Amino acid sequence: MLGALFLSTAASAAVQSIDKVVAIVDNDVVMQSQLDQRVHEVQQTIAKRGGGVPPTSVLEQQVLERLIVENLQLQIGERSGIRITDEELNQAIGTIAQRNSMSIEQFRAALAHDGLSYEDARDQVRREMIISRVRQRRVAERIQVSEQEVKNFLASDLGKMQLSEELHLANILIPTPESANSEAIQSAARQAMEVYQQLKQGADFAQLAIARSGSDNALEGGDMGWRKAAQLPPPFDRELSAMAVGDITQPARTPGGFIILKLLDKRGGGNQVRDEVHVRHILIKPSEIRSEEETKRLAQKLYDRIEAGEDFAELAKSYSEDPGSALNGGDLNWIDPNALVPEFREVMAKTPQGQLSKPFKSPYGWHVLEVLGRRATDSTSQAREQQAMTVLRNRKYDEELQTWLRQIRDEAYVEIKLPGAEQAAQ
């Protein structure tokens, strides 16, 4: 997320003194300065990948369309009361810095070096977090996958085949409106075939995606990342497994339009070995009547009492405020570390077996933990069930997200004022 934060944004310093509206989007607008800055970031991204940069006029239309759809989602977030607290934002910024092996101060310095202010970066992260939550509420929470669907998938030839490999894909989507008539569908089909013929003649896939694709990943050259083939709509699910790396599919109609896929890479599966830790803990939470400092002191006192010989389980039953484990003496049983919050996982990883951790803080409160054991288990069966669940959820989510984005775009009032762009008002 947010690779663009490390791109030069010198364009923002060159914004004209008189800004202007390039699109009216329901109750908001997109400004020329926003468009210029985002176009510059995209140009930098493409250049860093070593690709040819499309004409600015082509990029402007693609970027403007993305800004319009982002704006609509942010307006939905505003109407829905979605807010990102400073604490949540700080935590997200910290995670981004950590992923780039930086401290916050190093992260600030890197941003300044690339011409981007820390406040601009925070605003960008906040917007992405709001959009993520809007999509979670409007799309992801509606996705349901039944146990029977998982069983059917695992029993199918397709399921057995696809769970053994992952595919790195890119796509080009020629969209069709939700209520498209036959003429619009035929026009989209012709455009898709034109793109396909250009690709067969050696045109660069990423550049064509940037110039022609209507997918929300167009500006990334259509890169979809790693996917299970079974996530994809038919007929691609079976077709891709038989393809060689570098091959492209012929255009096929999907609910969102006509799509062309390129197979960038493959990787295989094998047995799944999972590390598990047997751990117990005591959780003390701050409250209206107990301050953060008092909570920390209580956790320290409990640590001292356990170190002095008192029984961990009895103290957990008496003091722990984790309803899921307190009655079991704080025992979380054997657990996958990846299921735990990073703060808990990191302390647990550093604590030797049979020893206590010093009191530490997580988003839930203050903890003292004890590692009782470690093991590696063959979780192939469980992993395959989880993979099947993920594949089916992702397949449904991808289809629902594209449908929903197209729906909110079609239903919005949008007036494009960018010179040379197609005029639209709804």
Curated annotation (Swiss-Prot):
Residues making up the signal peptide according to the UniProt record: 1-13
Query: Which Gene3D superfamilies does the UniProt record give?
Result: 3.10.50.40, Porin chaperone SurA, peptide-binding domain (1.10.4030.10)
Q: Which principal EC class is assigned to this enzyme?
A: isomerase
Functional summary from the UniProt entry: Chaperone involved in the correct folding and assembly of outer membrane proteins. Recognizes specific patterns of aromatic residues and the orientation of their side chains, which are found more frequently in integral outer membrane proteins. May act in both early periplasmic and late outer membrane-associated steps of protein maturation.
Instruction: Kindly report the protein's main subcellular placement as a broad class.
Output: periplasm
User: What's in the keyword line of the UniProt record?
Assistant: Chaperone, Isomerase, Periplasm, Repeat, Rotamase, Signal
What is the scientific name of the source organism?
Pseudomonas fluorescens (strain ATCC BAA-477 / NRRL B-23932 / Pf-5)
Subcellular location per the Swiss-Prot or TrEMBL entry: Periplasm
Q: Which reaction does it catalyse?
A: [protein]-peptidylproline (omega=180) = [protein]-peptidylproline (omega=0)
| Sequence ranges assigned to domain PpiC in this UniProt record | 164-265, 274-373
Q: What is the lineage of its organism?
A: Bacteria, Pseudomonadati, Pseudomonadota, Gammaproteobacteria, Pseudomonadales
Q: What EC number(s) does this enzyme carry?
A: 5.2.1.8
Q: Which SUPFAM superfamilies match?
A: FKBP-like, Triger factor/SurA peptide-binding domain-like
Q: Name one GO biological process term.
A: protein folding
Q: Which GO terms describe its cellular component?
A: outer membrane-bounded periplasmic space
Give the domain note. Answer: The PPIase activity resides only in the second parvulin domain. The N-terminal region and the C-terminal tail are necessary and sufficient for the chaperone activity of SurA. The PPIase activity is dispensable for SurA to function as a chaperone. The N-terminal region and the C-terminal tail are also required for porin recognition.
Per the UniProt record, one Pfam family is Rotamase
- Protein name in the entry: Chaperone SurA
Q: Name one GO molecular function term.
A: peptide binding
